[in-house]
Regions:
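A general structural motif
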Residues: 190, 223-228, 317-329, 348-350, ...
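Conserved acidic residues
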Residues: 52, 208, 340, 367, ...
Length: 540
């Protein structure tokens, strides 16, 4: 077996790993890198058309965001994911593609004015629609035979890992010719314990090799806060002042948790003097996501949420909930003076309808802006949390007079205690642990802790290649060890998206040529003539 790390190695985003085993090439996750690059990215060593299968741990864009790019560049094989992950990818990938198209359109307007060549989006909405035909949804806990031939057998099983609706760790049982079966587990993102709605992370049982995330491998979340009590206090204070509670929220996962909290607040009558206060969700993506949550309750909800469903209650709905679908609905929210809760995306305030709600509410001292998720450096959300007195929205200065608060403790990722508990629940120690999906220092810290506990562990680099056999791993290529640093020198020009696609098509053509070996001479000659004609046309 050979394992190649192509993303999220000593970084948090862009998860992508290549496995070559039993005569087949598999990709596990195909995520988009978000934020700043820390290490130089590596080119995929194989053309998308040569991949035999793709497996996804969950639907977050940093794990699935390049799936339509694979399709655009020739991949037509199966994509295995849980039912809920498949449903969420159906909306998240189209949303990502829409953003890609908008960014390309904006860049091309600038390029046209400066006389530069136009750029193509990494993929289009149509690519995102088309790739969904390749998905083959799977249930939790069932073994699936991916390949079974002379070179060996590969089976897969998905285990709920409690990070997001449909999230899973993936166990691959690999039997190569003449060898005993070995188990390779990809943890995916391991969920935080005792979070609302979805189940706690489950252990897949055993592994010979483990690829394990380390997002919070150097810290603890501390005691679990009483989210509902804290949210009630903030809401009561805001409504008493006659203001709106504006909540920037991620459309998938966090918004549904908030609806769960507000249902409890209303059901228990925790707010006094404001009966029937409205809660408005102003995000088309959040609306679609909430529908998917409701449709997947039987597989993914925890006991508490499932008990509500079985008693005839909807855990994500309550009197006074309004879903805003159209732009007209969104505009009307701020013309209505009734004090209310407004939940809108994006969670870091850098895009989406939330910016309009901030424009109308930030300057009002009776209002509150409540952050319920991580705010990255450089985002408007971080700027507000750090105490800015004025911000710019749509080119205009807006005074910050509203109260700015943060709901502490909400996280979809396990802390170091949660990671350790998950690992220690394996029936035996994995022979080797690869630590990924963590910032450089964090991944190294977690790998060192595992080594101190007696595990063979390492934090690979992007491009790192390892041979696996007999429970041991041997590094045969280290990968990119040099960190990217800013330079005062002019950066080298980057290849255009169109040129990158051309390169990918060239690799696809080579893959077809390789597969044509042994074909009929007549067909091969015709194929060669067609390629020669194409070369003659474009040779300069």
């Amino acid at each position: 077996m050979k394992l190649t790390f192509l993303g999220a190695a000593r970084e948090v985003t862009g998860s992508c790993t290549l496995l070559e085993a039993a005569g087949h090439i598999l990709m596990i996750d195909c995520g988009m890198e978000q934020g700043k690059d820390v290490y130089q990215n590596v080119e995929w060593p194989v053309a998308p058309a040569r991949l035999d299968a793709l497996l996804l741990t969950h639907a977050h864009i940093d794990h699935s965001g390049r799936v339509p790019y694979l399709y655009k560049n020739g991949y037509r094989g199966p994509i295995y994911a849980t039912d809920a992950t498949t449903d969420l990818c159906g909306i998240l990938l189209q949303d990502s593609a829409h953003i890609q198209e908008q960014e390309a359109e904006w860049k091309n307007r600038k390029a046209q004015r400066s006389g530069r060549d136009p750029v193509e989006p990494d993929y289009t909405v149509q690519d995102a629609v088309n790739v969904m035909k390749q998905f083959q949804p799977q249930a939790y806990g069932q073994w699936l035979t991916l390949f079974d031939g002379e070179a060996g057998c590969i089976e897969a099983r998905f285990t709920d890992v409690g990070h997001l609706l449909g999230s899973a760790s993936i166990t691959l049982r690999i039997t190569e010719e003449g060898r005993s079966p070995e188990l390779l587990v990809f943890s995916g993102d391991i969920g935080n314990r005792d979070q609302p709605l979805i189940k706690d992370p489950a252990c897949p049982g055993e592994a010979d090799y483990l690829v394990m995330e380390s997002t919070y491998g150097d810290r603890s979340h501390g005691p679990r806060p009483d989210y509902v009590a804290e949210l009630t206090e903030i809401l009561q204070t805001t409504l008493d002042r006659g203001g709106n509670l504006v909540i920037p929220s991620f459309a998938v996962g966090r918004t549904q948790e908030l609806l769960y909290f507000f249902r409890q607040i209303k059901a228990e009558g925790r707010i006094h003097g404001h009966d029937g206060f409205p809660v408005v969700v102003d995000s088309p993506l959040a609306s679609k996501s909430t529908t998917i949550f409701r449709e997947n309750f039987s597989d993914c909800f925890d006991e508490e949420a499932l008990a509500l469903v079985q008693s005839g209650q909807n855990p994500l709905s309550f009197p006074g909930l309004h879903i805003s679908e159209t732009k007209e609905d969104s505009v009307a929210i701020n013309t209505d003076t009734t004090p209310k809760v407004i939940i809108s995306a994006s969670g870091m305030c850098d895009a989406g309808r939330i910016r309009h709600h901030l424009k109308y509410n930030l300057w009002r001292p009776e209002c509150t802006v409540l952050f319920v998720g991580y705010q990255a450096a450089g985002t408007l959300g971080r700027t507000l949390l750090e105490g800015a007195k004025e911000v710019k929205l749509f080119g205009e200065p807006v005074a910050v007079r509203a109260s700015v608060r943060q709901l502490s403790g909400l996280s979809g990722h396990a802390d170091q205690e949660g990671l350790a508990d998950w690992l220690h629940s394996f029936s035996r120690k994995p022979g080797f642990v690869f630590v990924n999906h963590g910032d450089d220092a964090v991944a190294q810290h977690w790998a060192k802790r595992l080594q101190e506990e007696g595990y063979a562990a390492e934090a690979p680099y992007n491009g790192g290649v390892y041979l696996l056999a007999g429970g041991h791993a041997a590094c045969c290529e280290t990968g990119n060890t040099q960190r990217l640093v800013k330079s005062a020198a002019q950066p080298a020009p980057r290849s255009s998206a169109a040129y990158e696609r051309l390169l990918s098509m060239g690799r696809r053509l080579m893959a077809i040529i390789e597969r044509s070996r042994g074909g009929a001479n007549k067909d091969l000659a015709k194929f060669a003539d067609q390629i020669a004609a194409l070369c003659d046309k474009w040779e300069r």
